[in-house]
Amino acid sequence: MDIQQQKFWNILLVGDSCEDIYHYGVCDRMSPEAPVPVFRELRQEVRQGMSSNVKLNLKSFGMKVEHVHNSEKIRKHRFIEEKYNQQLFRYDQGEEKKVYPLLPRMSRGYDAVVVSDYNKGFVTPETFEFLKDQLPPGMPVFVDSKKQDLTCFKDCIIKINESEAHKAIIDPTQEVVVTLGASGARWKDSIYKTEKVDVFDVCGAGDVFLASLVYGYLKHGDMSKAINIANKCASLSVTKMGTYVLTTEDINDLCI
C-alpha cells in the first residue's frame, strides 16, 4: 500500500537532539607546524541527528510528531576527506551544557510515545516517571536509551544494540529488541535476519530502526512484523552516507 494512503498516527517523541554537521574537503598538503595534514573545506552539510533524526523518520511514515527536546542542540562536527570518503576526526559542541527537561501536560491524543535517550541529561528517571504518570494505561512506549540502568523504563518496549545490551541492567520482565548489526535483530528467543548489504555508514541506523519499529508495530500490532520492517529500513540506511532520513519512495519500494 502506498504510504500516502495509510493511517496517520500521533506520536509524542522525547529525547536529546543534535545537529550533525559534515565538513567535506581535501587534504593535499602537510602542515609546516606539525606532522599533520591540512584540511581544506569544500562544502558543508547540516543534518538533524539523535532524536531529531528519529522525528524526521517518523514523519516519513506519515506520522504527526510532537517533539520535546533540549532547546539548545548539541553539534557534532565531522570532517571527511571527500576523495576517499574517509572521516578524519570529529569534535562535539554543547554536551557540557546543563539541560533542564521540561515536559508539558500531556494530552491523551497520542497513539504511542517514543523516548530517544542519548544520555546527555535531558531524559532523567524523574522526567520519565512524570511522563509515564500522565499516560493512559496500555499506551505503547518505545525506548532507545544509552543509560546503563534501564530498569526505570518499566513496561516499555526497549530497543538496544548488542554491545550496549551486554553492559545494561535490564529487568528480566522487560520487553527488549536487540539489534545485531549485519545479523539482524533478536527478540525473546528468536533471531530476525536481515539481507546482506554493502555497509557505507552506520551513523543514524539505530534511529531509522527505532522509527520503523514504531511504524511497524502500530500498523500490524505484531512485534515480529515490526522487527522485519525495521530490519529492512535500517539495512537501507547503512548504504547511504551520513545521517539518513527515509523517503516516501524508499518506503514504497520496500513494500512495507
Residue ranges and their predicted role:
Residues E95, G109, E126-D155, H166-I256:
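Conserved phosphate-binding/catalytic region of the ribokinase-like
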